[in-house]
């Protein structure tokens, strides 16, 4: 069977060729040859294009992936860097705001400092003019032979022979000092009402303390000129003289006046104030006892002079009395030193605002004493 099938297939193939079944194809073979090359070229070009496109696609995909990876990495890094940069911007804004506020504060402080300097220069100029006027008045008083007494209490004219130029100068300086004191107290009152800062308030407190120091310096010069005038208190009003102690106020009295206006105090402040008050009272007692002994010694020296009045030689008792009178000047200076030390120690114990309130209370206290004296002098009197 196999041989038959193979023979039959062979027979069929031969018979088909013999029958001319492939002749048309053989006729087209002449046309097939030119198109075949074109077809082959087209096919090869298509294959080349497909292979190249495939290659491009294969090459392009990794490049795109790399670009995407780079883009994602850059975006991620930018996102990571965005938060610190925003925080840095906020920090820089806060720093810039602080610097702007600080510069504004510095400009405001400089402006206030210029205003204070301008006011201080103006005050110095006014003081210079007032001092010049006082000097001219003093010269005229000397030429006219008149002695000018304190205008705030009583005024009287005395003979030229009894006039002490040092005391006349002190009276005029003290009148000017009172005007300045009223102005400084008014400034402290205004500052406390305006609630200004502690730095500016401390400047006012120090200025007021220095003003009291000037008063003590003036009194020391007046004591050299006439210590009895200073001790008598003729340069003060009658109400002030009622409370006078060795040419001025008692330091313990100062503390009693100031204390209600500086409260509340801390425990440490209370302890220090009590110690200051105790030491001031002890110093007052020591000075008072020393003054009593001085008066007693003066009385004894004068009594000795009475016994030897008929004696020709009485120079020794008089010399002893003069020494006692010279010691009186030292007592006045020591009392003023105690007053000044009490003021300074009190200001150190208190805060700046408490010290300002204390100086305001002290200034108002003396101002009301002077006003009370004026009211007393102007009271209606019954005619008898």
From Swiss-Prot:
Residues 76-88 have a biased composition (Polar residues). Keywords: Activator, Coiled coil, DNA-binding, Hypersensitive response, Nucleus, Plant defense, Transcription, Transcription regulation. Residues 117-144, 267-296 form a coiled coil. The keyword Nucleus applies. One of its GO terms (molecular function) is DNA-binding transcription factor activity. Hexadecanoate binds at residues 219, 236, 249. The keyword Coiled coil applies. Expressed in the whole plant. Binds DNA as a dimer. Interacts with NPR3, NPR4 and sumoylated NPR1. Interacts with GRXC7/ROXY1. InterPro entries: bZIP (IPR004827), bZIP_sf (IPR046347), TGA_domain (IPR025422). Residues 167-379 form the DOG1 domain. A motif (Nuclear localization signal) lies at residues 99-106. Residues 96-138 form the bZIP domain. Transcriptional activator that binds specifically to the DNA sequence 5'-TGACG-3'. Recognizes ocs elements like the as-1 motif of the cauliflower mosaic virus 35S promoter. Binding to the as-1-like cis elements mediate auxin- and salicylic acid-inducible transcription. Required to induce the systemic acquired resistance (SAR) via the regulation of pathogenesis-related genes expression. Binding to the as-1 element of PR-1 promoter is salicylic acid-inducible and mediated by sumoylated NPR1. Belongs to the bZIP family. It comes from the Eukaryota. The gene is TGA3. Residues 58-68 have a biased composition (Basic and acidic residues). Residues 39-55 have a biased composition (Low complexity). Residues 36-70, 76-95 are annotated as: Disordered. Residues 124-138 are annotated as: Leucine-zipper. GO terms for cellular component: nucleus. It is found in: Nucleus. This is Transcription factor TGA3.
């Amino acid at each position: 069977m196999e041989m038959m099938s193979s023979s039959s297939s062979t027979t069929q193939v031969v018979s088909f060729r013999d029958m001319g079944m492939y002749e048309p194809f053989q006729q087209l073979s002449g046309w097939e040859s030119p198109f075949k090359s074109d077809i082959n070229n087209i096919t090869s070009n298509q294959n080349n294009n497909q292979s190249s496109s495939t290659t491009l696609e294969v090459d392009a995909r990794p490049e795109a992936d790399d670009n995407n990876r780079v883009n994602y990495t850059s975006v991620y890094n930018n996102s990571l860097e965005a938060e610190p940069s925003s925080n840095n911007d906020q920090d820089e804004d806060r720093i810039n705001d602080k610097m702007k506020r600080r510069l504004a504060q510095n400009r405001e402080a400089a402006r206030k400092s210029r205003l204070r300097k301008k006011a201080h220069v103006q005050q110095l100029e006014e003081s210079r003019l007032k001092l010049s006027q006082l000097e001219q008045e003093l010269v005229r008083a000397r030429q006219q032979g008149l002695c000018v007494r304190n205008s705030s209490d009583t005024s009287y004219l005395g003979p030229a022979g009894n006039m002490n130029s040092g005391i006349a100068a002190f009276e005029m300086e003290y009148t000017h000092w009172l005007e300045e004191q009223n102005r400084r107290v008014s400034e402290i009152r205004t500052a406390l009402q305006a609630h200004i800062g502690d730095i500016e308030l401390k400047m006012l407190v120090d200025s007021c303390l220095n003003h009291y120091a000037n008063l003590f310096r003036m009194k020391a010069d007046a004591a050299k000129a006439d210590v009895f005038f200073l001790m008598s208190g003729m340069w003060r009003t009658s109400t002030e003289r009622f409370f006078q102690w060795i040419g001025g106020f008692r330091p313990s009295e100062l503390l009693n006046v100031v204390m209600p206006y500086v409260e509340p105090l801390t425990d440490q402040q209370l302890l220090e104030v009590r110690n200051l008050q105790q030491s001031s009272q002890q110093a007052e007692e020591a000075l008072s006892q020393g003054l009593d002994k001085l008066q007693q010694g003066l009385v004894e020296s004068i009594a000795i002079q009475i016994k030897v009045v008929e004696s020709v030689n009485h120079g020794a008792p008089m010399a002893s009395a003069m020494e006692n009178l010279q010691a009186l000047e030292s007592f006045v200076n020591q009392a003023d030193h105690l007053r000044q030390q009490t003021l300074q120690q009190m200001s150190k114990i208190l805060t700046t605002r408490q010290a300002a309130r204390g100086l305001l209370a002290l200034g108002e206290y003396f101002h009301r004493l002077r006003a009370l004296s004026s009211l007393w002098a102007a009271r209606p009197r019954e005619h008898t």
